[in-house]
Amino acid sequence: MSSESSKKRKPKVIRSDGTPTEGKRNRSDTEQEGRYYSEEAEVDLRDPGRDYELYKYTCQELQRLMAEIQDLKSKGSKDVAIEIEERRIQSCVHFMTLKKLNRLAHIRLKKGRDQTHEAKQKVDAYHLQLQNLLYEVMHLQKEITKCLEFKSKHEEIDLVSLEEFYSEAPPNISKAEITMGDPHQQTLARLDWELEQRKRLAEKYRECLSNKEKILKEIEVKKEYLSSLQPRLNSIMQASLPVQEYLFMPFDQAHKQYETARHLPPPLYVLFVQATAYGQACDKTLSVAIEGSVDEAKALFKPPEDSQDDESDSDAEEEQTTRRRPTLGVQLDDKRKEMLKRHPLSVLLDLKCKDNSVLHLTFFYLMNLNIMTVKAKVTTAMELITPISAGDLLSPDSVLSCLYPGDHGKKTPNPANQYQFDKVGILTLRDYVLELGHPYLWVQKLGGLHFPKEQPQHTVMADHSQSASHMETTMKLLKTRVQSRLALHKQFASLEHGIVPVTSECQYLFPAKVVSRLVKWMIMAHEDYMELHFTKDIVEAGLAGDTNLYYLALIERGTAKLQAAVVLNPGYSSIPPVFRLCLNWKGEKTNSNDDNIRAMESEVNVCYRELCGPRPSHQLLTNQLQRLCVLLDVYLETESHDDSVEGPKEFPQEKMCLRLFRGPSRMKPFKYNHPQGFFSHR
C-alpha cells in the first residue's frame, strides 16, 4: 500500500484570490453530493466488523511508523531522510484511512440514530394507539354499566298484576300465546294495556270535568237565587220578632248565638254545644250564652297585615327603641301576660235551682296553656243576711271546690304547662286563679279536654264524647252543691243566735225536752284547728285539709261546757262533718281520757245516717248538733251523785234510760229509741 501511494501523484491545487465561478461551484457540490451518497451506499455494503479490524490494523501501523520515524530521527544520519519521508507518506495514507473509517462510523451512527428514532416513533405511535384503545374500552365499559343500571320509565309505573292483566286485557293486547314465554313481550303488552286504561281514564276525567263545570254553573245560579232571598228572609225575620217574643220562641237570638259560636275555640265550642243539647233534652232551666268581643275573636284568625312605614317613621321608632329598652322584669311580665291570655269569647251557663237561686258559671279558655277555667257566682231570689260564719260558703273561691274528690282547682291539670311556667318564671297557677278562674278537672272534661299524665302533650284535641259523658253528672252535682250551701247559709244564721233549727220531718229523732243549748257557733281558721289539742288524731289521719271549712260550737248546761270542733268537707252533705269533743266539767275530758266522750263522738260521726233526714240530707249538720245537746244531757244526768254533797243534784235525771251503765268502762246509754222515747246502749 505504501508503494502504491508513493507512486501516485498529488493533485494540483490552484489557489486564486478571486471567488470561483458559479459553474465551478455547482460542479464541486455535485461531486461532493455524489461522494457523500457513495459513502452512504458503501456503508451499507461494508462489514462493520472488518472495518473495526481495519481500524485496529491501521492504528498499529501508525504506532509502528511513528516509532520507526522516531528511531530514524534519533540516529541523526543524513541517509534516513528519504526513509522518513516514505514513512511519513505511509502515515498520511493511514491517516486518510482512519478519516474514512471515522466518516463511515459517523454515518453508521447517524443511520443507527435515525433507525432508533424511527423505531421510537413507531413505538410511540403504537403506545398512543394502545392508550386510545384503552380509553375506548373504559368508555365502553362505562356505557355498558350505564346501560345495565338504566331504569326505564315503565319500571316506575305500577302495572296491574299478571292475573288481572290476562283476565281483563283483550286478546289483541294480551297475546297470551306470545307473552307467556317472553318476558319482554309480556312487559310491552302490559304497558299497552296500561296506556289503554289511562286513555279511558283520561276520557272519563274530561267527562267529569265537563260535569263539574255544569254543576258549578248550577251552583252559581242557585247562589244568586239564595242571595236574592236573603234580604227577603231578613225582612220576614224582622217582622216576626214581636211574634217570637210573644210565643217565647227567640229564633233570631238563637241564630245570632250560633253564628257567634263559630268563633269559639274548640273546648268552649264543645261546652256550648253539649250544654245547649243537655238544656234542650234534660234541663229546661239551663240557659247558655256567649259573652265577649266577636271582632277580637275574628282578629285572632286573621294573618297580620304587612305595614310599610316611611323611612322617617322607622328611623324614629329605631331611635325610640334604642333609647327605651325594657328591663328584664318588664319583659318577663309581658311574657307572663301573653302566656296567661284568655280568649276574647267566654261561655256563660245559668243553672237555676228549685228555690229560684241561680248559679252563674263563666267559662274561659287560656289559649297558650290549652286549659279552661271557670268563675262562679250565686244569686238568690231574696237578699240573704250573711252571717259571719257563712262568709266562705258562697264565695267564688270555694263554692265549687272539690266538686269531685280532690279537685280543688288550685293547679293546672295540663302537665305540659309546668314547662311553659319555667320559661317565664311562674311557680304555680295558684297565684292567678282569682283573676283567671279555677281550672277544675271537671271543667276540662266539660270542654272535652283530657290530659294523660303518663305522656304530657302540648296540644290536646277537644272531644265531644268526653264532654257528653260528664255533662249530666256535673250539672246535678252543681245543683246539689248550691242547694246545700244555701241550706247551710240559712242554718248558720240560726246557729249564730244560739238556735239549732230542726225541721218537722226530723223532730222524731230527738226527745221532746232538750236542756243543753248551743251558746256559740263560730268559724275558725285551719291553723287554729290544727293547734287544738283534742283534734290531733284528725290532723294525723289527714282529714284536716286546707280545702275544708272549720267551725267551733260551744254547748252548755249549767257548769258543764262542751266544745265541738267541726270539720266541714266541701262535699257536704254527701260527706258528713267530723266532730271532735272536749268537755269541761269536773276537769277536761276528751276521747283520750273518757270512753263516754269517745262514744258521743261515735254517735255523731259513725251513726250519722240516722240523722240524715229526708233527702237531700241538708239537715245533717243541725241534727248532729241537736244530737250533741241530747248526748250532753244524757252524759250529765246519768253521772253518779256524790252522797257526801248535800242538796239536790245539779243535773237531775229527766231522760228515761233502761240501764245507766254497762261494762267495766261504765258506758252510758246514748242511743235514742224514738218510738218509745227511752235511751239504751248500742
UniProtKB/Swiss-Prot annotation:
A motif (Nuclear localization signal) lies at residues 7-10. The modification N-acetylserine is found at residue 2. Residues 1-42, 300-334 are annotated as: Disordered. The keyword Metal-binding does not apply. Pfam families: FmiP_Thoc5. It comes from the Eukaryota. It is found in: Nucleus; Cytoplasm. Residues 247-682 are annotated as: Tandem RWD domains. Residues 2-199 are annotated as: Interaction with THOC7. The modification Phosphoserine is found at residues 5-6, 307, 312, 314. Residues 81-247 form a coiled coil. Residues 2-144 are annotated as: Interaction with CSF1R. GO terms for biological process: blastocyst development; cell morphogenesis; monocyte differentiation; mRNA export from nucleus; mRNA processing; negative regulation of macrophage differentiation; primitive hemopoiesis; regulation of gene expression. The keyword Acetylation applies. Its main location: nucleus. InterPro entries: THO_Thoc5. PANTHER family: FMS INTERACTING PROTEIN, THO COMPLEX SUBUNIT 5 HOMOLOG. Component of the THO subcomplex of the TREX complex which is thought to couple mRNA transcription, processing and nuclear export, and which specifically associates with spliced mRNA and not with unspliced pre-mRNA. Plays a key structural role in the oligomerization of the THO-DDX39B complex. This is THO complex subunit 5 homolog. It comes from Rattus norvegicus (Rat). The gene is Thoc5.
